């Protein structure tokens, strides 16, 4: 029932089965995968390629500029496409209604043919990507929280180093408020801080001694 394989045939079959994948061409590797074949036919990741995408029917200006653009490009090889479009747009505006009418008729004929060929066609314009703004201003909520944090931190500073703390905190608070808060709000906060410092100066010596003994010394950088 079973045929006897020669040693040479068996060796050739084993070598054919043990051929590594990197020894084969990329075309053979792609054609063995049905998913890859579908990707090749549709162009990329399974979506329709630009060639299979249905284009909009031409309007009257596009019908007129189709030949005019080619003529201007041949006459001015160094002219860019944007400059050619501007020139064609200006020339189209200078035409009279009688001169434009044949191109409107041709555009209507092309649109009728397009509707017959693609009855379910709907124009879907591509959305432009929004630019990401990297430089954003500090929100008002975060700036107010920063001011409250600065005031709370200064309350824990000893009396002997309060002047240095206020001098270090006031420029930072003013810089944050200048970009997000009005000037009058910054002035009111500074006045509140000065009032707090002046009231602490009128404390009794016993209260000051208690604060100095309870709080650890603060060494400004």
From Swiss-Prot:
GO biological process: cell differentiation; male sex determination; sex differentiation
Cited function: Transcriptional regulator that controls a genetic switch in male development. It is necessary and sufficient for initiating male sex determination by directing the development of supporting cell precursors (pre-Sertoli cells) as Sertoli rather than granulosa cells. Involved in different aspects of gene regulation including promoter activation or repression. Binds to the DNA consensus sequence 5'-[AT]AACAA[AT]-3'. SRY HMG box recognizes DNA by partial intercalation in the minor groove and promotes DNA bending. Also involved in pre-mRNA splicing.
DNA-binding region boundaries: 54-122
A GO term from the CC aspect: nucleus
Record organism: Hydrurga leptonyx (Leopard seal)
InterPro entries the record matches: HMG_box_dom (IPR009071), HMG_box_dom_sf (IPR036910), SRY (IPR017253), SRY-related_HMG-box_TF-like (IPR050140)
Pfam families noted in UniProt: HMG_box
Keyword line: Activator, Calmodulin-binding, Cytoplasm, Differentiation, DNA-binding, Nucleus, Sexual differentiation, Transcription, Transcription regulation
Protein name: Sex-determining region Y protein
Subunit text: Interacts with CALM, EP300, HDAC3, KPNB1, ZNF208 isoform KRAB-O, PARP1, SLC9A3R2 and WT1. The interaction with EP300 modulates its DNA-binding activity. The interaction with KPNB1 is sensitive to dissociation by Ran in the GTP-bound form. Interaction with PARP1 impaired its DNA-binding activity.
Molecular function as annotated in GO: calmodulin binding; DNA-binding transcription activator activity, RNA polymerase II-specific; RNA polymerase II cis-regulatory region sequence-specific DNA binding
SMART domains: HMG
Gene name of the encoded protein: SRY
Protein localization: Nucleus speckle; Cytoplasm; Nucleus
Family from the record: Belongs to the SRY family.
Predominant location: nucleus
């Amino acid at each position: 029932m079973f045929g006897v394989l020669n040693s040479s045939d068996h060796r050739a079959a084993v070598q054919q089965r043990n051929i590594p994948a990197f020894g084969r061409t990329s075309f053979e590797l792609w054609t063995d995968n049905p998913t890859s074949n579908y990707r090749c036919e549709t162009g990329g990741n399974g979506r329709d390629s630009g060639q299979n995408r249905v284009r909009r029917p031409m309007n009257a200006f596009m019908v007129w500029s189709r030949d005019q653009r080619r003529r201007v490009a041949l006459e001015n090889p160094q002219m860019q496409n944007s400059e050619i479009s501007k020139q064609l747009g200006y020339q189209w505006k200078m035409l009279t209604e009688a001169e434009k009418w044949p191109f409107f008729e041709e555009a209507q004929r092309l649109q009728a043919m397009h509707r017959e060929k693609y009855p379910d066609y709907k124009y879907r314009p591509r959305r432009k990507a929004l630019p990401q703004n990297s430089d954003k201003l500090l929100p008002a909520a975060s700036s107010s929280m920063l001011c409250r944090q600065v005031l709370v931190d200064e309350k824990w500073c000893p009396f002997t180093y309060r002047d240095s703390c206020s001098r270090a905190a006031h420029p930072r608070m003013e810089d944050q408020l200048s970009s997000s808060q009005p000037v009058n709000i910054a002035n009111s906060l500074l006045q509140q801080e000065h009032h707090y410092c002046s009231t602490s100066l009128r404390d009794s010596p016993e209260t000051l001694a208690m604060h100095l003994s309870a709080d650890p010394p603060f060494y400004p950088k």
